[in-house]
């Protein structure tokens, strides 16, 4: 092979620190670093706040952090699905509040069993998602407009459901236990063992299938790295939680939504259709994908997860009131998805984005409170982090377009 036959991409590499920096910038522009920037950012946030307040990484505070992010993190998982389509849902905040209020009213005022009241709250979310999804797909009204209208309408519905009192206290143990249950040490270690075992079995199964099909699979070192990360993460998390009150049920519910959504998007035909529609809707339609159905189902899933987040929030504060679903819930839910690595332009991201982004936002808010910073500083810092994440996303998209991979 002559010099002119060398791949031009290889010719750009330079030895030394300067070459490594240029290669890092190239990979960042083309979106090849995955979740690494988010993880490094999270580590930096934790190091800073731990140095500012030694209680930040204590088991008690980390348990509180998980409880704080479980609600809007669950909402953010649904937001990830909508963003994967290249759409937006501005109504998820008040959908969560309305679902929590519906559950509280039915349980407290109408004496519904807690389980059925929870199911009704989830059904309200699913129904709203179906309505908004059909409005977007059948009437061709942009999702921004439809869900902005929903933002206003569901806020009004929340006030109507609560009535003149404006607040309903929740005392049923089935509901309050959602955020108040902590599992024993034995249960925690069992869950960690299950997580590690399933990861190992998944890696072995995938490698065997690749070998049987004669395909070149993922390098062994990457699979080993995945197993190590999951193992260390599970062991450390359980050890931290067990040092306090135990593994929180609310955190498991949030993680459950992440895992189920990750399986849906990566392991099912419907999940591949979501990425296809988000990448190029017209190409997906010509390939035979029922684009409108995919969009409608995603809006239903997003609103249902918003309802679940609202129910968790009501369980944590032991009430549903006029501020439920308001404040910074919507912005935190969207920001978590974007900061975690989900593209605003559609077609790129994962359910794990919600977890990573929620940890970043929750850590900033929690750390600011510990060091006594006021809300104004907290919001400005969170806004700066969101702007940085959106900028990286835009730069990465331009890099992929330039390289013909978008």
PLM regions and their residue ranges:
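Membrane-helix/interface signature in polytopic inner-membrane proteins
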Residues: 205-221, 260-299
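Cytosolic-side transmembrane-helix boundaries in multi-pass membrane proteins
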Residues: 1-43, 166, 197-228, 236, ...
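Transmembrane helix-bundle core of multi-pass membrane transporters
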Residues: 151-265, 322, 402-406
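Alpha-helical transmembrane segments within multi-pass membrane transporters and channels
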Residues: 111-152, 357, 361
């Amino acid at each position: 092979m002559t010099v002119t036959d060398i791949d031009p991409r290889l010719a750009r590499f330079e030895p030394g620190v300067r070459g490594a920096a240029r290669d890092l910038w190239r990979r960042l522009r083309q979106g090849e670093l995955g979740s690494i920037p988010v993880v490094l950012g999270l580590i930096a946030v934790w190091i800073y706040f731990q140095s500012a307040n030694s209680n930040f990484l204590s088991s008690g505070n980390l348990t509180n952090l998980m409880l704080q992010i479980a609600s809007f993190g669950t909402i953010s998982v649904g937001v990830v699905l909508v963003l994967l389509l290249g759409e937006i849902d501005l109504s998820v905040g008040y959908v969560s509040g309305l679902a929590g209020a519906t559950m509280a009213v039915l349980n407290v005022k109408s004496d519904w069993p807690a389980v059925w009241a929870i199911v009704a709250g989830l059904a309200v979310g699913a129904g709203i998602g179906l309505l908004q999804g059909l409005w977007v797909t059948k009437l061709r009204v942009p999702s921004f407009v439809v869900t902005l209208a929903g933002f206003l309408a569901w806020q009004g519905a929340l006030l109507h459901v609560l009535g003149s009192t404006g607040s309903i206290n929740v005392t049923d143990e089935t509901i309050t236990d959602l955020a108040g249950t902590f599992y024993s040490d034995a249960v925690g270690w069992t869950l960690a063992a299950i997580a590690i075992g399933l990861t190992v079995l998944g890696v072995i199964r995938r490698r065997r299938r690749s070998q049987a099909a004669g395909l070149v699979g993922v390098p062994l070192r990457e699979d080993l790295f995945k197993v190590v990360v999951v193992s260390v993460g599970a062991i450390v998390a359980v050890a931290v939680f067990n040092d306090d009150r135990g593994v929180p049920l609310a955190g498991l519910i949030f993680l459950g939504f992440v895992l189920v959504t990750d399986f849906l998007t990566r392991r099912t035909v419907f999940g591949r259709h979501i990425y296809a529609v988000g990448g190029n809707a017209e190409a997906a339609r010509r390939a035979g994908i029922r684009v409108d159905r995919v969009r409608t189902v995603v809006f239903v899933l997003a609103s249902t997860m918003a309802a679940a987040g609202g129910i968790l929030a009501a369980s944590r504060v032991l009430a549903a009131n006029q501020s439920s679903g308001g404040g910074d819930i919507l912005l935190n839910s969207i920001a978590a998805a974007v900061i975690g690595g989900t593209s605003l332009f559609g077609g790129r991201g994962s359910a794990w984005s919600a977890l990573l982004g929620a940890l970043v936002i929750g850590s900033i808010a929690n750390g600011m409170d510990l060091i006594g910073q006021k809300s104004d500083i907290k919001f400005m810092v969170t806004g700066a982090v969101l702007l940085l994440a959106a900028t990286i996303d835009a730069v990465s998209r331009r890099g992929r377009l330039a390289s013909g991979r978008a």
